[in-house]
Amino acid sequence: MLATLSTERGRLDRLTHTEHLPAREARYAPWPQGIRSEVIAAAGELGVTLPWAHQAEVMDLAKTGQSVVIATGTASGKSLGYLAPLLSDLLDGTEARNGRGATALYLAPTKALAADQRRRAAELVPARVRVALYDGDTPPEEREWVRQYASYVLTNPDMLHRGILPGHPRWSTFLKALKYVVVDECHSYRGVFGSHVAQVLRRLRRLCARYGSSPTFLLASATTAEPAVTARRLTGLPAVAVTDDASPRGPLVFALWEPPLTENVGEHGAPVRRTATAEAGYLLTDLVGNGTRTVVFVRSRRAAELVALQAQDQLGSPLAGRVAAYRGGYLAEERRALEGALQSGKLLGLASTSALELGVDVSGLDAVLMAGYPGTRASLWQQAGRAGREAQGALAVLIARDDPLDTYLVHHPEALFANPVEATVLDPDNPHVLAPHLCAAAAELPLTDTDLELFGPSAAPLLPVLEQRGLLRRRPDGSWYWTRRERAADRVDLRGSGGSPVQIVEASTGRLLGTVDAAAAHTTVHTGAVHIHQGRTYLVRDLDLETSVALVEAADPPYTTSARDITSISVLSTDTTVEWGEARLSFGSVEVVNQVVGYLRKRIATGEILGESKLDLPPRTLRTRAVWWTVTEDQLLDAEIPLDQLPGAAHAAEHASIGLLPLFATCDRWDIGGVSVPLHPDTGLPTVFVYDGHSGGAGFAERGFRRAVEWLTATRDAISSCECERGCPSCVQSPKCGNGNDPLDKAAAVRILDILLAGAPGGPSDGDPANSAPGAPGAPGAPGAPGAPGAPGAPENADEPRTAGFPAPPGD
């Protein structure tokens, strides 16, 4: 398959590396004690006569009441590992008066995955174990039945947070009998979302304890580093990690692929490569044409539709009918039909978002194409693992996007194949996350001193501040209770970035097209912005921040828009500093102030700037965590960087470092932002900041501090190895730059990183606690946190995160 792809149409130079992963034999173990004969018989009907060794280990641990996290590869049977003991215990209670004894709760990050789990559970147990979905689509008349009679309830963290926990009196019999909590795809709970879910699970444990139960947690994860540490951060409980994968695997050929340069040029004349999605469309066409069953993973719903459409157009009839798109937003029946068609061979090609990545059972694939690095090595292997199930050989191809991270990876294969999978980053102690969950917990049941131990050391200092705000009140017995009439849980959006979403409304019809986070509105739906919805193009006629409405009208402009902004950053406090010779690396708390002041109109085909318009939008303020580094004037002289080159050098280094941080922290470049300043008032030196794009921080900047030597070395290598002359999207240009990628000095960026790294042989790393950054018990933005010690700096250049209080212009 790979030879066909690379030799056709002169593509051989696009193949940058090929990795051959050998096959692996299966290792089996006997069924553990306590697994019911009905479950064993049902497994036998599915072709499982004996469990693999890692499945049996999970079963043993679960039956002894130990919380466990199973972190093995795709198609390694994680579900059977936790379902066998869980369903066995549920079967033991079916003689109870209401038809259930013990109960179990299953949490999935997506509704599609929960529906797939219901099917798997139904295959393993008789009908007397009542398995039920409980989500936003469950009709009211069914919800009461689920609460009273279901043994195994399948839901998601959002429904647990908004429905089950606030309504716990109606769930009392279920919670009293709760024996197991399954947290599936737990590696997806990262950053601020993961921190929210960690607090939801602590609230669940607290209510269970009040009702007299202490459930065992069973977590399933893709292969990640430190799964036991992640499980403990997520649940607050120690967990045993099962990581020795005993499932069989066929040989896998893993190829790294770089699309060709095009005749077009981008900003400032930079060379531009063909997009990863367009290249994926060509490769999918060839694979389907050769009868190869293939899935293409893309980063957006629109890209899934475009790749499928491109392949259909190129294939023509009758093969065009054997290619489809698969994404969130389809009806469950449509998704199941597509999965079945792919498994049966009726479909040969499927272009999918990550909706197909998370646990949905699709087997028998010959090839997987990934149109862009999915953000983490865990997701990369999760997607690649969809190929070659049932011990078949398979092909996986990573197609690089035109950005620093993807370009670095396809030219540095050791970063993917020689390094361990990264650990999941989350920070349950973030006060911006913890405080609203303390309010929600107090609304469920008054908080006691014993409860505070469950929520960690950062909880107690927050209570007086919440009392001062009029949210909580302390009783004479020392407990804390919720004072408002509104539901406390409604003040927390587990997946959002805060603020009421802005509604996008078609002006001529009043039809609601969609919503966008308040944090993203200034840069994505400002007046004059080009907005794309389901393949149609609109212009934003007006953004009303008071009513949270953006009015749009259908249009077909020959340009895209990109917001221009001004950003300042000030240091609130420095947690720790490491000397790198004359240079310094620091980690601490910062305040970032951003204001969108205008937008550029760029020609679609070339990126040529057609004009600029001014905007008058209010500034937005974010208190968060950051890593920053400084160099001295003497170092700049040694590196032959004159003052007129310094802004471009620092700006280019900042862009590239943001692009490379996702390789070392489980984040996307849109989760973080950066600022470069030739002379910062708080440091008195040239300074480059990289900060978390969420209030209070998300743990990404801290991971950058801990792995700064590796991170900044990779940044330097990514810039220096790029073949362009002055900078391009593959090295130092950023799609979210608020300054139009100006100024940038590629050569000087390499020199400034060289002088920074010259003094850093003993820099911080994850394995060196003495140099690692501490946690964030007093993270910025916490109620009562001190103000900025000085006025915000006036940086020359800034690169903003999409998920912050002030996101970036949209990019690929």
Segments predicted by a language model, with ranges:
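Helicase motor core with emphasis on the C-terminal RecA-like subdomain
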Residues: A3-L46, L50-A53, E57, K63-V69, ...
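Generic structural signal for buried aliphatic residues
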Residues: E57-V58, V68, H531, Y538
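Long, charge-rich boundary regions
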Residues: R293, V578-V590, K602, A758-D768, ...
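Extended Lys/Arg-rich polyanion-binding regions
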Residues: G393-A396, D402-L416, D427, H437-D449, ...
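Short cysteine clusters
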Residues: C722-C731
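Short, non-ligating residues that shape and space the ligands of small metal-coordination modules
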Residues: C737-G738
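Small-residue-biased low-complexity repeat regions
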Residues: G762, G767, S772-R802, A808
